């Protein structure tokens, strides 16, 4: 039985030598793109392979895209195969930012039709706090056969976001920190603010004080308060570039509210077109 949402540090520790488990290290810092790779080289969870947000999980950005466009599904599938991710594999993704980066790969693998992927709850910080093993060895890859079955209904484009903004028939949830949403502070993108009609729910609201996810019942209560009767399929998630928005998608899955969708281009794509409206404040 595979997990498709969260895996505990205890479960991962018990399966470190299990050939049916594949571990992927997704540590990444938006303001220092090589920091994650460098820290991985110094120490990581045994058998973990490194996955880079820019190089592996994104296509090169253009003047019309956000900062982290989705890669060609076939290219990503080839990488998954090279990392040994075939059928009947439990994939565990982790980072050192409580899932903020690793959730991108969690979402992308589900988008490609691989349900057996889970986030390490509490991530690398919890693993270290518990004094679990780390090493600097590079695992030898064993190529696997895997399928590429992208599901287009999980993705929303800018036109649908524009319609939702104007009509209100879908709920747009922005996962960025409050100050970026209001436009008070914008360290990454040239325009500050948010899509008119969107609501702000920073991804770290999904976390308990120890950096693990809140219990399912607490997440469900929180999201039902946001949805106000709307079904999950009428929810569009966004953030700065389609990364931390996946954290809210995962939280809704844990809460028993599956079916919400991602706007991959997010804010950094939205602002490329000056015809798209921008709001500031709450």
Regions found by a protein language model. Give the residues of each.
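Cytosolic catalytic domains that perform sulfur/thiol-centered chemistry
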Residues: 1-282
């Amino acid at each position: 039985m595979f997990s498709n949402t969260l895996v505990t540090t205890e479960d991962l520790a018990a399966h470190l030598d299990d050939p049916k488990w594949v571990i992927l290290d997704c540590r990444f810092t938006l303001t220092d793109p090589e920091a994650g790779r460098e820290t991985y080289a110094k120490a990581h969870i045994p058998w973990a392979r490194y996955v880079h947000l820019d190089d592996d999980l994104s296509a090169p950005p253009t003047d019309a895209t956000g900062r982290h466009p989705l890669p060609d599904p076939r290219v990503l599938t080839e990488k998954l195969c090279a990392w040994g991710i075939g059928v009947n594999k439990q994939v565990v993704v982790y980072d050192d930012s409580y899932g903020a980066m690793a959730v991108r790969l969690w979402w992308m693998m589900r988008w490609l039709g691989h349900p057996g992927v889970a986030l390490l709850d509490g991530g690398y910080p919890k693993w270290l706090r518990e004094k679990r093993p780390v090493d600097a060895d590079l695992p030898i890859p064993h190529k696997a056969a895997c399928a590429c079955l992208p599901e287009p209904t999980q993705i929303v484009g800018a036109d649908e976001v524009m319609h939702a903004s104007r009509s209100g028939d879908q709920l747009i949830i922005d996962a960025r920190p409050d100050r970026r949403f209001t436009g008070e502070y914008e360290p990454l993108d040239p325009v500050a603010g948010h899509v008119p009609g969107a609501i702000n729910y920073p991804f770290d609201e999904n976390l308990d004080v120890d950096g693990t996810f809140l219990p399912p019942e607490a997440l469900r209560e929180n999201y039902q308060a946001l949805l106000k009767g709307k079904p999950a399929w009428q929810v569009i998630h966004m953030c700065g570039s389609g990364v931390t928005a996946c954290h809210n998608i995962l939280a809704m899955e844990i809460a028993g509210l599956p079916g919400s969708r991602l706007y991959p281009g997010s804010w950094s794509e939205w602002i490329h077109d000056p015809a798209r409206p921008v709001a500031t404040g709450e």
